[in-house]
Every structure is written in C-alpha cells, then in structure tokens.
Amino acid sequence: MDLFEYQAKKLFAEHGVPVPTGKIATTPQQAREIATELGGKVVVKAQVKAGGRGKAGGVKVADGPDDAFEKASAILGMDIKGHTVHSVLVEQASNIAEEYYASFLLDRANRTFLAMASREGGMEIEEVAATNPEALARIHIDPLTGVDAAKAREIAVAAKLPEAAIEGASVLLVKLWEVFVKADATLVEVNPLILTGDGKVIALDGKVTLDENADFRHPENAELVDVAAVDPLEQKAKEKGLNYVKLEGQVGIIGNGAGLVMSTLDVVTYAGEEFGGQRPANFLDIGGGASAEVMANGLSIILSDPSVKSVFVNIFGGITACDAVANGIVQALAIVGDVSTPLVVRLDGNNAEEGRRILKEANLPVVKPVDTMDGAAKLAAELAAAAA
C-alpha cells in the first residue's frame, strides 16, 4: 500500500526523521488557516499517489495566508496523472542549499535489502539511473545487522555527499531504516533529502510503500487506506477476506487458485470474441475455501456489479472436493436469494461427478453445469452477450 506524502512524513516524524512542519488541508480556507499558524512562506503540495506533481503544477510556494488560499484553490480538484487532488499539504518553506536522494527498498531480484543514495536529488531517480548511473550509489544491507551509524556513513560517503552533510545524513539514514523495518515497508524514499542553509539535513519529501502481507502486525494501517481511491467492491471483498480485483467486462469469474483464475480470464476473453467482445468482469480467487459463506460472499460481491451479466464458476477439486463446492453453491444461492444472473459451473477433479449430481438434483434454473472449461467459457460469454 502506497502512502500519501503527509502520511509518510507523519511516520517519519514518529521515528525521529526531521521533516518540515506542516498540516493537511482539504479546503482553501483550511490552507489559509494553516499558513497563518505557520507564518512566513509556505509550500502547498498536492496529495496524490503519483510522481511529477511539480511539473503538473501541483506544488506551489505561497507568500502568506491569502496566497496559500489562492494556491490551494488552484490545486484542489486538479487531475494529476489520473489522480484527483482531494487534499493538500501546507508546510513551512525550507531554505534549500542542496538536494540529495536516499531510499531503502526490498531488492527482490537479489532477495535482500538495498540502500540507494545520490548527490543528485530532486528529480526522477529513474532519470539519474539512466543518464548518470555512477551518481547513484547502491549498497546491499545485511538484514541481520541492518543500518547502524557506520553503515549509514558508508551509504552517505558512497553517494558522494559533501562533508557538511555526512553527519546529518548518517543520523537520518539510521532513523529512516528504523521506519523501513518497524513499519514493514517495501520502500522508503526521500527525494529530495535536503541540506539547508544552516546545515541541517531534512526529508523534504517522502514516499513509503507498506507490505500489506504484514497488515496483521499493524492494525493501525487500516486508518491509512485511501477510501476514495479504493473500488467499493474491492474494499468489501478485502473485508470478507477475498482476493478480488474488479475488471471492465461482463462475465463474473470465481475460481480456486490464482493460476486457474488467470487461465479462466484468458479463456473467457478468447471465447468472448465470438460474442461481441465479452470480457471478464473480475478476478476472484476463493482459494481452498468453498463453504457456503465464502461462496455467498463471492457471489454477493460479483452480483453487486451491474456490469456482470453472467458468472463463470471454475473449480478444480483437490484438497477442496467438488461436492463440497457444489453444496456451497447451492447454499450460497439460498443465502444470497433472488438471483437471476446465470451461473455457468465447471467442476473437475476430486469428486467432480458427485458435485455435478448435487447441482443437477438441486434443479436451480440459474445454474448451468458444463463439463469442459472451453465449453463453459463459451456459454458464459454467450449468456452475457444475450443479456446485454
């Protein structure tokens, strides 16, 4: 999960990383009040989870409260790379002498942690890596020892930071590593990391990506979710413990196992070409769970999408037997109630014959059992096209 800048900076401050004083505003009037409280020049910064805010006009310096009101009025509601600006961070302007770059990230290719730092900050780091790769220091971090003062100094020196910034940057890097580890982050980035005119090293910007697999250790992360940016069906599925991603098609998909569901998306897309371009409406992996409750939750979410005209339930029985899935489907339809959208069901594997028998004897008009995956995909696409 990516954090907004203001959320990242709050996390930084909690761990002792120096950041400019600032507050979040959702209206121009709030921006004016914050600027009055801070005094002097302030910076009004669009809060979106996208880069290039400055180039898009989403970062503006204001000379005082009234100017902050005007700048916030111009920024709020802007579209930056497909993201609408709903809030701005109003913070004290900094006296910038030099700009650097620093980050800690999970290096998946080498299965370790990586520190990256550069004397060339304030620009897209990808640009630095492409045009001047020697300016970007890369230091692998031993997860058993982490980043202490000596390691932090090694990173700062490797980045060729000036002597005036080495000590301050080293202290900041140790604290930044603490954020990375304690927050269970996969990325912690400061760009720019600045040296001020009076010799202080400050995180002027902040980017943090949290590992959602570690959410069980961080119940407080629920408060960080950007509800406005999350699809309501995806949020509902997450609350139910379901792995659901909304797509743009008309055929709802339920499967057990990510690989099978991905294959199902492909087969439905191919079959849909024959029926006016019908496509998958979602990705929904129920994993090993085929209980009535899981099925009911899955169907309820999929059928809440008005674009869904048919549902393809594709199950390969393994540890979860097909007869259990069939019973789950029958009970789920009773729980959901009043379902008119056709369900094409393909069962294969463990106890598939028994599963088909259960569906047949249930005599549910909306359930259409099909033996093959290709045949089921074709029927699901055909039914969706007919209902469009």
Swiss-Prot record:
EC assignment: the record states: 6.2.1.5
Question: Which GO biological process categories is it annotated with?
Answer: succinyl-CoA metabolic process; tricarboxylic acid cycle
Binding of substrate, residues: 256, 318-320
Asked if Magnesium is a keyword of the record, the answer is: yes
Name the keywords, alphabetized: ATP-binding, Ligase, Magnesium, Metal-binding, Nucleotide-binding, Tricarboxylic acid cycle
Which PANTHER family does the UniProt record give? SUCCINATE--COA LIGASE [GDP-FORMING] SUBUNIT BETA, MITOCHONDRIAL (PTHR11815:SF10), SUCCINYL-COA SYNTHETASE BETA CHAIN (PTHR11815)
- Protein name, UniProt field: Succinate--CoA ligase [ADP-forming] subunit beta
State the organism named in the record. Answer: Parafrankia sp. (strain EAN1pec)
UniProt gene name: sucC
